[in-house]
Each structure stands twice: as structure tokens, then as C-alpha cells.
Curated annotation (Swiss-Prot):
Species this chain originates from: Buchnera aphidicola subsp. Acyrthosiphon pisum (strain 5A)
Designated name of the protein: Cysteine--tRNA ligase
Keyword Cytoplasm in record: yes
EC id: 6.1.1.16
Organism superkingdom: Bacteria
Gene: cysS
Length: 464
């Protein structure tokens, strides 16, 4: 019996699809103004895992992940690069697919682009105005009134009073409430504006998902997902306008992935600590990164550092070592008890850390049987590969994986630490040239040192 943590109720609930054996799943996709970063990777690997498991469990899944191909950042970036918006977004979507393919993220059933659904967006906004959930500003903007929804703040568990007290109202503010948000943004520039009853303009961010989910799911969604950074205001606003448009809640479960933490800080462009997937994957095997993403429960923050990446590599190396020199390609009933444990872990809100511990138990069994019982060894090897494949793992040839270099490429963790210790000794002895030479050697290998009062820490230079 599958249980999923529902953000709306803040509890684990038994998952019962709206239609028997069918799951409608929607995930907020990428705004394609730049390359995909590690936060995108974490979220979409998680939902790829969820879709794979639901299908493995016998559900027919309709998976839709949108693409935002019009917004202020896209306009700014395309202008800067002197490209037409359509040309720019097409190239960024292509790059997004390259990154996701490397990570083994399956293509969703539908990947709608916002600009293909402008008519649907206008229709919904028109209805919201008629129902007095939205108002038109004199400049042509259409704005959603959060005061028209008495349940606003329910999803993110925030009261209107506390939200309003934390907002600052600018002079000449065009909104009735500072938390009101744009549904339609007035714009007269031809390349990124469309005709509407309120004049030329383009859609606001939040209305996009409401329009697309209405088109593809006919007001009926089992699971809506995204990163926890989208919970407020994006998902709160989306839910509010969707309920006001449809006169009911159309989403049963809300799921959110935890943040990626870098050097004890949330990843953020403003902090200058955004790591692009393609830069990380230059010297990290894609399956290692995928394993890293799922080694922490999807709802929890995940701490990105070389040590944790190296740990993911070591874990995968152990599993591939168990599969090495086996023939796991025939079905059998050996190890079904492990499969039951696998189901129990996955049915507990997709508990992948527990699943990985089960994989290790099977691997230990294989290692124990090697050179003792070839037939049983191969049977358990099948069970390990069969279960792991269904989550997107262990597709590589074991020999090829084991011959690859580690995630650090040229240096092991131990070698790096030895060099740092040697440099510390040189500094204590005031051998500044020797210490500087070691720093330069590490820098040439993209190892960045940071001297603290009591120790020296290091990181791999994978910044954008």
C-alpha cells in the first residue's frame, strides 16, 4: 500500500488514484533562460524515479512536465545574446534535453511549451475577471486578487495576516493587496506579446501551470510536484487561481523536493553558487550523480560536496563489483524476499535510502555466493539488476564502470588530503614558496583551497 507525504495536509497519506490504476502526474518544469543546474537535476531525477516506480507497480502514468519559454529572464537573456526569443528558447530546450538524457531522466509523456497555450491562458483569465477574482489595471495588467480566495495560504500553511505584515507596499502600488499577483503583463513589444481583450501582453508565471493542467488533465490531477522553492508563492498562487477558476480543488497530492545545500548555503544565483549540471558531469559519472540525488530522502535537503559525491561513487562501485563476472540476464524467483523489502521501502513515501540498503544486502549475498554457487550467484545478480534498473540504475557494463576514474578524476580524496597536510606543514615552517606551489598544483586540477583559522577546507571548482 503506497503512502505519500502530502504537502497540503503535512501528513503521509494512502495513495488512491482518482481513476483506478491511472495516475495523472504534473511537475513544474524549467524556465529555459540558462543551462540546467544541480537543483533542476535533483528535482527531475526524483520525479523520474517516482514515475518509474509507479509504472513498475502497475499504474498507467500520464506524466506532464511543462516548459516556460517566455518570461522576463528569457527576454533579457535573448536580448543580451542578440537572438530571437524562439531561436534562443529552442536552443536552450535542446541543451536541457542533453543534460537530462545524461542523467537518465526519461522524457515525459507531454512537454508543453507555454507559448502554445496563450489562448487557453486568456480564456482562464477572462473567467477569473468575470468571477471577480481578478481586476484590470489601467496600464493593461490583469491582477489576481488574493482577498477573493478565503483559503489563500492553505498549501504553504501561512495566514493572510502574517503574509501581509511581512510585505512592503511601494508608493503608487497598482495592486489592491501587495500579495496580489500578475496574470497578464502588458507589453507592446511584438516579439513577445500577444493580443488579448486587455491589450497586447504576455502571461504571468503562475497562470501558465493552471492553463496547462486544465488542458492535459481536465481538472483531475493525482500528484502535482516541484521543488520546495516553488511552494510559495508559485504553487500557492497556482492552487488559488485554479480553485477559483474550477470551483473546486483539482489536485489530490502536492509533493515537494528538498533544497540543494552548497557550503551550508542554499543554492542561489544571487549568492553566486549555482552549479550547472554539464560542468559537474565533466568529471562525475552521470549515474554517480543520480545515485547522490537519491541517497537522501527526496523531501530532505541534500548537501552537495565532493565527499558526498565520492561516497556515491564508492556505493555504486560496490554494487557493480558484485555484478562483475555474473550473468544476471534470466528471470527467476530467487531473492523475492528482497523484492518485498524493496516494495515496502518504496511504498513508504519513496524511501530510496532504505532501498539502497536493500541493494547492498543483495550485493553482499552475491559476494558470499561467488565461487561457491554460480547458479545462485546469477539468480541474485538478476534480482539486484532487475530492481535497480527500475529506478534507473545499474545499466552500465560492470567492467566498464569499474575501469572509470573516480568522481575526482586525477586525484583521490586521500591524495588531496595528503597534499593539504604537506602544505600545512610547509606553512607552519614558513616555507611559503613550497606551500604556494602545492596550492598552484591543486588549482591546476580545479581544487580550490580555503584557509580557515583552525583548518584548510577544499572544494572542486565546478561553478558556472
Amino acid at each position: 500500500m503506497l503512502k505519500i507525504f502530502n504537502t497540503l495536509t503535512s501528513t503521509k497519506e494512502i495513495f488512491t488514484p482518482i481513476k483506478k490504476n491511472r495516475v495523472n502526474l504534473y511537475v513544474c518544469g524549467v524556465t529555459v533562460y540558462d543551462f540546467c543546474h544541480i537543483g533542476h537535476g535533483r528535482t527531475f531525477v526524483v520525479f523520474d524515479m517516482i514515475v518509474r516506480y509507479l509504472r513498475f507497480s502497475g499504474f498507467q502514468v500520464k506524466y506532464v512536465r511543462n516548459i516556460t519559454d517566455i518570461d522576463d529572464k528569457i527576454i533579457s537573456k535573448s536580448t543580451k545574446e542578440k537572438k530571437k526569443i524562439n531561436t534562443f528558447t529552442a536552443s536552450m530546450i535542446k541543451e536541457m534535453h542533453k543534460d537530462f538524457d545524461l542523467l537518465g531522466i526519461s522524457v515525459p509523456d507531454e512537454e508543453p511549451r507555454v507559448t502554445d497555450y496563450i489562448d487557453n491562458i486568456i480564456r482562464i483569465i477572462t473567467t477569473l475577471i468575470k468571477k471577480k477574482h481578478a481586476y484590470i489595471h489601467k496600464n493593461g495588467d490583469v491582477i489576481f486578487s488574493i482577498d477573493s480566495d478565503p483559503n489563500y495560504g492553505t498549501l504553504s500553511r501561512q495566514s493572510l495576516t502574517s503574509l501581509e505584515s511581512g510585505s512592503r507596499i511601494p508608493l503608487n502600488n497598482m495592486k489592491k493587496n501587495p500579495l496580489d499577483f500578475i496574470l497578464w503583463k502588458s507589453s507592446n513589444k511584438e516579439e513577445y506579446s500577444w493580443d488579448s481583450p486587455w491589450g497586447k501582453g504576455r502571461p504571468g508565471w503562475h497562470i501558465e501551470c493552471t492553463a496547462i493542467t486544465n488542458v492535459f488533465f481536465n481538472n483531475s490531477i493525482d500528484i502535482h510536484g516541484g521543488g520546495s522553492d516553488l511552494l510559495f508563492p508559485h504553487h500557492e498562487n497556482e492552487r488559488s487561481q485554479s480553485i477559483c477558476f474550477n470551483n473546486k480543488s483539482m489536485i489530490n497530492f502536492w509533493m515537494h523536493t528538498g533544497m540543494v545545500i552548497l557550503n551550508n548555503k542554499k543554492m542561489s544565483k544571487s549568492l553566486g553558487n549555482v552549479y550547472f549540471l554539464r560542468n559537474i558531469l565533466k568529471d562525475c559519472d552521470a549515474e554517480v550523480l543520480r545515485y547522490f540525488f537519491l541517497s537522501t530522502h527526496y523531501r530532505h535537503p541534500i548537501y552537495y560536496c565532493e565527499k558526498n559525491l565520492d561516497q556515491a561513487y564508492t556505493s555504486l562501485k560496490y554494487l557493480y563489483t558484485a555484478l562483475y563476472d555474473t550473468n544476471p540476464f534470466f528471470n527467476n524467483e530467487e531473492g523475492l524476499n528482497f523484492e518485498l523489502e524493496f516494495y515496502n521501502a518504496m511504498n513508504d513515501d519513496f524511501n530510496t535510502p532504505a532501498v539502497f540498503s536493500i541493494f547492498f544486502k543483495i550485493a553482499r549475498k552475491i559476494n558470499f555466493l561467488k565461487n561457491k554457487d554460480i547458479l545462485k550467484t546469477n539468480k541474485f545478480a538478476f534480482r539486484l539488476k532487475y530492481l535497480a534498473n527500475n529506478l534507473g540504475f545499474l545499466f552500465q557494463d560492470p567492467k566498464e564502470f569499474l575501469q572509470k576514474k573516480t568522481t575526482l578524476n586525477l586525484l583521490t580524496l586521500k591524495e588531496i588530503q595528503l597534499l593539504i597536510e604537506k602544505r600545512n606543514i610547509a606553512r607552519q615552517s614558513k616555507l611559503w614558496q613550497e606551500a604556494d606551489n602545492i596550492r598552484k598544483k591543486l588549482m591546476s586540477l580545479d581544487i580550490i583551497l580555503e584557509d580557515l583559522p583552525d583548518k584548510t577546507i577544499w572544494r572542486k571548482n565546478k561553478k558556472s
